[in-house]
A protein has these predicted regions:
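Alpha/beta enzyme core
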Residues: 1-302
Length: 302
């Protein structure tokens, strides 16, 4: 026990670390290309190791107790009663769920069974997943992401874990693209809010081209900008507003903590978004990426 106590300590299994060190394909970039069971295997390995450490130390104490004189038994029993377990909370990164909500549920269930008590999930498209600090990220509409948050919650509840923790990460700040246009049934609903951030141009039916995707926004007919890859583009400068909406909806639909991924440490930017989030959810709690890929000294000096 390097810190002499495990109080407020935990293990965090990040996706980029698993991809780099635990994939059978060899070191991979942080793009969810590693086997989805790699994280499960590492959770089980670590959890078993920590339990074995407990068994070793407690076994030694009980042997001491059996062999001790009557006058020494009280102090040994006190050490047993106040024994601090090696087992600490394990936080597991499930990336974007490695598939749809059903796949997310099945993988989350395996992670929890292996020993995870907290699961982090992000709103990127699973098969377009990028490292949080890279460009070219693609997000999914809120309905898709909330379905995956619910899938993780169902996995916890099915296994009898009522206090399992879900961290909802938004990559919207650095994501300029979406895989699809959100389904919307009425003006102002969540799908409509998501689509309102799209980069569009007003058109009329006569100027529409064959194969164009057209939307009605208010009284206007608009054409969202679509790339040759069939991805749709958000308007520049909408990242912060999208992050705020992501966080509010995630917390309102099953997430316990929020994670706003940024390209560099920017305390004022994070603080501004949190103020807006807490106008709606006063007790919102943020986790932040203390990433080794950030040059913390340089950024704080700047």
């Amino acid at each position: 026990k390097h810190f002499e106590t495990n109080n407020k300590k935990y293990l965090y299994l990040s996706g980029w670390m698993i991809a780099a060190l635990r994939s059978e394909f060899g070191p991979l970039p942080d793009q969810s290309m590693h086997e989805k069971t790699s994280v499960v295997s590492l959770i089980a390995e670590l959890y078993q190791f920590l339990r074995q450490a407990d068994a070793r130390e407690l076994g030694g104490l009980f042997r001491e107790l059996d062999a001790a004189k009557e006058s020494d038994k009280e102090s040994i029993q006190d050490r047993i009663d106040n024994f601090e377990t090696h087992v600490v909370p394990i936080i597991a990164d499930i990336d974007a769920g490695f598939g749809n909500e059903e796949a997310t549920y099945l993988l989350a269930k395996q992670m929890i069974e292996a020993g995870a008590c907290c699961i982090q999930i992000e709103n990127q498209v699973s098969d377009e997943k990028q490292c949080g600090h890279q460009d070219g990220k693609v997000t999914v509409p809120h309905a898709d992401f909330l379905a995956k948050i619910n899938a993780v919650r169902y996995a916890f509840l099915e296994l009898g874990v009522d206090d399992g923790v879900i961290v909802a990460r938004t990559d919207s700040l650095g994501a300029g693209l979406t895989k699809q246009i959100a389904v919307t049934n009425e003006k102002g609903d969540l799908g409509d809010q998501y689509n309102s951030f799209l980069d569009v141009e007003e058109v009329d039916q006569d100027s529409a081209n064959h194969g164009d995707v057209l939307m009605k926004q208010g009284d206007k007919l608009v054409r969202p900008k679509r790339l040759p890859s069939n991805l749709f583009q958000f308007r520049p400068g909408t990242g912060e507003a999208r992050c705020i909406l992501d966080c509010i909806t995630s917390l309102q639909n099953g997430a316990d903590l929020i994670w706003i991924e940024t390209e560099k440490p920017h305390i004022a930017q994070i603080g501004g978004m949190m103020k807006e989030i807490r106008k709606v959810i006063p007790n919102a709690k943020l986790t932040y990426n203390n990433s080794p890929s950030f040059n913390w000294t340089l950024n704080f000096r700047q």
